[in-house]
Curated annotation (Swiss-Prot):
The keyword Cell membrane applies. One of its GO terms (cellular component) is plasma membrane. Pfam families: Ammonium_transp. Belongs to the ammonia transporter channel (TC 1.A.11.2) family. Keywords: Ammonia transport, Cell membrane, Membrane, Transmembrane, Transmembrane helix, Transport. The gene is amt2. The keyword Iron does not apply. It is found in: Cell membrane. This is Ammonium transporter Amt2. GO terms for biological process: ammonium homeostasis; ammonium transmembrane transport.
């Protein structure tokens, strides 16, 4: 311990002027921010694991591998799309010179000197991959794998980055307060899924004579496990959105925790003890708090989470009554929960309600409406165009009945069941 103090003293003794001291401290601060962003980004990356488990548990066992593959592909192609297009589009729009400069940088030898830029790029990437993965749960069990890959590529390379650029994280053409992405990430993903669900149509047997027929998932414990895995990653999602170690907020951690609790309690009450709705309510509470996690009080976070959780089974049934087959409930869990969180931020973020202030309810409503129109409209159009380009959006009736694990990947998730 004494040796460490001497080394530190020697270091400052060698700093003979203010300039060298400032330079050393700046280097240390940059290194700390790089470390912070990478660690927080890895936590967010863990959410891919959570999504895979949450979605995997909610589909039938004949489609589990397909869900896992889609989640892997979201990440794999998302990395490439974000590197060459998405990462620069979200900050610079369609500025051709910015693209050229970025491509020169990534194809050149300047990478080691841009550690903070690359850490920020990585943190943006994991957010983008989250938005794309949300769509997977809504269109499960009947979409062609090739169609999904193309949809995911366009979301990560174009639709998500453009939405970021238009919103508060980019040029703020449509401004609203969205600290960690209730609308930018989750709302967008949920409403892109809604548009794709409408274009795709329901699974075989999901509706008979216009009446909904439940199709149960194969493993509820897996889904619950996935919800808790997502919750762990959410601390990186929200706390990491400060983007700098020096700006980290304990309030964000507290409001995130209380919203998670509120979401689970709300869904538990509204669903009358349904395990799957409660697990999804936890996620909905976390989605809703993202927008105002830095400006509402912990009690405000609890209220936001509670309302987001209460609406999950209600909105799920409304979507079902509309004849739409949202397999994993991504519309209520991400879409409407994101909208609720954004709008309530404009209320509970006000100082009169114990918030930090600096938010506008009108801006929050405008942002929510913009997200709904942008996401649903482009999700529907994209799915239709992809279907035309590939000669169909869905697998055949025979393949759907067989299950996408065998039809698309030639491998069952539980092969021991085929052994006599």
């Amino acid at each position: 311990m004494w040796g460490e103090n001497i080394a530190t003293a020697d270091l400052f003794a060698n700093a003979t002027d203010i300039h060298s001291i400032v330079q050393a401290l700046t280097t240390l601060a940059n290194a700390s921010d790089v470390f912070f962003l990478v660690v927080m980004g890895v936590l967010v990356f863990m959410m891919q694991w959570g999504f895979a488990m949450l979605e995997g548990g909610q589909v039938r066992k004949k489609n589990v591998n397909n869900v896992m593959m889609k989640n892997m592909v979201d990440w794999l192609i998302g990395c490439v799309a974000w590197l060459f297009i998405g990462g620069i589009l979200c900050s610079k729009g369609f500025d051709l010179s910015a693209f050229i400069d970025w491509w020169k940088q990534i194809l050149g030898t300047n990478w080691p000197n841009n550690g903070l830029d690359l850490a920020s790029w990585f943190f943006g990437l994991v957010f983008c991959a989250t938005a794309a993965t949300i769509v997977s749960g809504g269109v499960a069990e009947r979409i062609k794998f090739s169609a999904y890959v193309l949809i995911s590529l366009i979301i990560t390379g174009l639709l998500y980055p453009l939405f970021v650029y238009l919103g508060p994280w980019g040029a703020s053409i449509v401004p609203w307060h969205d600290y960690a992405g209730s609308l930018v990430v989750h709302g967008l993903g949920g409403f892109l899924a809604l548009g794709a669900i409408a274009a795709l149509g329901p699974r075989i047997g999901r509706f008979v004579d216009g009446r909904p027929v439940p199709i149960l998932g194969h493993n509820i414990p897996m889904a619950v496990f996935g919800a808790f895995a997502l919750a762990i990653g959410w601390y990186g999602f929200n706390v990491g959105s400060s983007l700098a170690l020096g700006d980290i907020s304990g309030l964000v951690c507290a409001t995130t925790t209380m919203a998670m609790a509120g979401g689970g309690i709300g869904a538990l009450i509204a669903s009358r003890n349904d395990v799957l709705f409660t697990a999804n309510g936890i996620v909905a509470g976390l989605v809703a708090i993202c927008s105002g996690t830095d400006v509402v009080s912990p009690i405000g976070g609890l209220i936001i989470g509670l309302i987001a959780g209460l609406q999950v089974p209600i909105v799920y049934k409304l979507v079902e009554k509309a004849g739409l087959d949202d397999v994993c409930g991504v519309v209520p869990v991400h879409g409407t929960a994101g909208v609720i969180g954004a709008i309530l931020t404009g209320i509970l973020g006000l100082k009169i309600f114990g918030g930090a202030g600096g938010v506008s309810l009108i801006d929050q409503i405008i942002g929510a409406v913009f997200c709904i129109i942008y996401g649903t409209g482009l999700g529907y159009i994209l799915a239709k165009i992809v279907g035309i380009a590939l000669g169909g959006l869905r697998v055949s009736e025979e393949e759907e009945k067989m299950g996408l694990d065998m039809a698309e990947h030639k491998m069952p998730a539980y092969p021991e069941e085929t052994v006599i």
